[in-house]
């Protein structure tokens, strides 16, 4: 095997490991971004603990075919950034990518892998609207406390109007 071929095989293995070890992957197009804008996007995603990489589409196709996500092949054309993220930060990362897409007309979400399924760009945008784990817990806690707060407020109003005596 030639040296060049060995490097290519190693790259495909690296991509395969990234796919296997991450909770998901988002593919987005970045054609038209300047180098500084691209670096800014990568830094934003790095702050959300996402692994942002640029690979040849052919290498990614080989790796995703091996991983069983062949449906993603049709989205791999043009200049793409591949964002790998872990389970803990998946929703926050997807929200950040959607936010970047809204701010920058040159960034276009194409597709991704989320919870072991290939998802389209529209599905990625829907996922971005879902609350993060922490936000969901806050919503749950708030909804559980609301009835108790209403009872407490009602009792306080009765005491204030002297319908009942506070002891």
Swiss-Prot record:
<dbReference type="Pfam" id="PF00466">
    <property type="entry name" value="Ribosomal_L10"/>
</dbReference>
<keyword id="KW-0689">Ribosomal protein</keyword>
<dbReference type="InterPro" id="IPR047865">
    <property type="entry name" value="Ribosomal_uL10_bac_type"/>
</dbReference>
<dbReference type="InterPro" id="IPR022973">
    <property type="entry name" value="Ribosomal_uL10_bac"/>
</dbReference>
<keyword id="KW-0699">rRNA-binding</keyword>
<comment type="function">
    <text>Forms part of the ribosomal stalk, playing a central role in the interaction of the ribosome with GTP-bound translation factors.</text>
</comment>
<keyword id="KW-0687">Ribonucleoprotein</keyword>
<dbReference type="InterPro" id="IPR001790">
    <property type="entry name" value="Ribosomal_uL10"/>
</dbReference>
<comment type="subunit">
    <text>Part of the ribosomal stalk of the 50S ribosomal subunit. The N-terminus interacts with L11 and the large rRNA to form the base of the stalk. The C-terminus forms an elongated spine to which L12 dimers bind in a sequential fashion forming a multimeric L10(L12)X complex.</text>
</comment>
<comment type="similarity">
    <text>Belongs to the universal ribosomal protein uL10 family.</text>
</comment>
<dbReference type="GO" id="GO:0005840">
    <property type="term" value="C:ribosome"/>
</dbReference>
<dbReference type="GO" id="GO:1990904">
    <property type="term" value="C:ribonucleoprotein complex"/>
</dbReference>
<keyword id="KW-0694">RNA-binding</keyword>
<dbReference type="GO" id="GO:0070180">
    <property type="term" value="F:large ribosomal subunit rRNA binding"/>
</dbReference>
<protein>
    <recommendedName>
        <fullName>Large ribosomal subunit protein uL10</fullName>
    </recommendedName>
</protein>
<dbReference type="InterPro" id="IPR043141">
    <property type="entry name" value="Ribosomal_uL10-like_sf"/>
</dbReference>
<dbReference type="GO" id="GO:0006412">
    <property type="term" value="P:translation"/>
</dbReference>
